[in-house]
Amino acid sequence: MSHTTHPYQKELEVATLAVKRASLLTKQLSDSIVQTARSGTLTKDDKSPVTIGDFALQAIINHAIKLNFPSDEIVGEEDSQELQENSSLADQVLSLIIKIQQETSVYNDVVGTLTDKNKVFQSIDYGNSQGGLKGRFWALDPIDGTKGFLRGDQFAVCLALIEDGKVVLGVIGCPNLLENIVSNEEHSGVVGGLYSAVKGVGSFYSELFKEGAEPLSQQKPIKMQNHTNPSQLKVVEGVEKGHSSHSTQAEIKAKLGFDPTTVAKQTVNLDSQVKYCVLASGQADIYLRLPVSDTYREKIWDHAAGNILIYESGGQVGDVTGAPLNFGNGRTLDSKGVIAANKEIFDKVIDAVTEIRKSSTPRV
């Protein structure tokens, strides 16, 4: 399929411009948080910038979707109740939205504008879909990687389109991600990446803060590498230990033959779906997210956009048993953990996971 003939042209344009507008807003917020933290006026438990950002982004992106595709449903993280009960918070959210609309007014014809609080509440509440196996809906994570966002580190704006339980389009904006990620210490290149994937077409990289929606033919196609030698492999995993089992992941790397003297340099720790972007662009080979408890289930918006990015760049994604993730099961994935890897190594990774899980405590 050529880059110019895929059936999701309009969807991709709307998703791209909505994510670009939203990403610019989050970049400004994240940078201001870092400045505030440096001045010593941000308390550790102050989550208000995240709350404001989440609400503003969900309103902006949901409005763009409903303006262009009124019959589409949206699975979103927030509802507007807290905002409706706090007029000061609502004023802050509306003010941010109006400001970013003025700064990105060139996008208004495509993604629309919000000018009053009631429209903001309504747009946020469009995200109340339960998803499911039939029909068409979008999955949105407005600020994926909250802790990275607060640190001024990695976070992502993630939007995916799902049809009959299958992801067909994904767009991930990574405001703080540098183009080249070699290790935890070595990052270089342009700051801000936009990663897009369309089913049957491929995965692509472009500069996030470049104005407009470039056609895929002008974007950089990205592909996973096919490394299998343990000395060449790199693993991406989360920063926060509460999100995945780092100790189990260390055992898996040992089982795969990683050299204990170099494994630290071969592991890149990143918050959010940024991990999928680094993997899809061939800068890492394996993504491990082992469950920290037997009952935890992932939310679909945490993985939908990343899932298609990996498949369309030549990789494979599954749960801890290797089974593909099912995005038609409602708002959560009915499976444990997430493993992604290049196709050459995927089965070996799943075998290692299976062996470690058999020999460890039942919770893994």
Swiss-Prot record:
Adenosine 3',5'-bisphosphate binds at residues 146, 243, 272, 275, 289, 302. SUPFAM superfamilies: Carbohydrate phosphatase. Binds 3 Mg(2+) ions per subunit. GO terms for molecular function: 3'(2'),5'-bisphosphate nucleotidase activity; metal ion binding; nucleotide binding. AMP binds at residues 243, 272, 275, 289, 302. The active site is at residues 54, 146. Disulfide bonds: none annotated. It comes from the Eukaryota. GO terms for biological process: amino acid biosynthetic process; phosphatidylinositol phosphate biosynthetic process; sulfate assimilation. Belongs to the inositol monophosphatase superfamily. Phosphatase that converts adenosine 3'-phosphate 5'-phosphosulfate (PAPS) to adenosine 5'-phosphosulfate (APS) and 3'(2')-phosphoadenosine 5'-phosphate (PAP) to AMP. Regulates the flux of sulfur in the sulfur-activation pathway by converting PAPS to APS. Involved in salt tolerance. NCBIfam families: bisphos_HAL2. This is 3'(2'),5'-bisphosphate nucleotidase 1. It comes from Candida albicans (strain WO-1). The gene is HAL21.
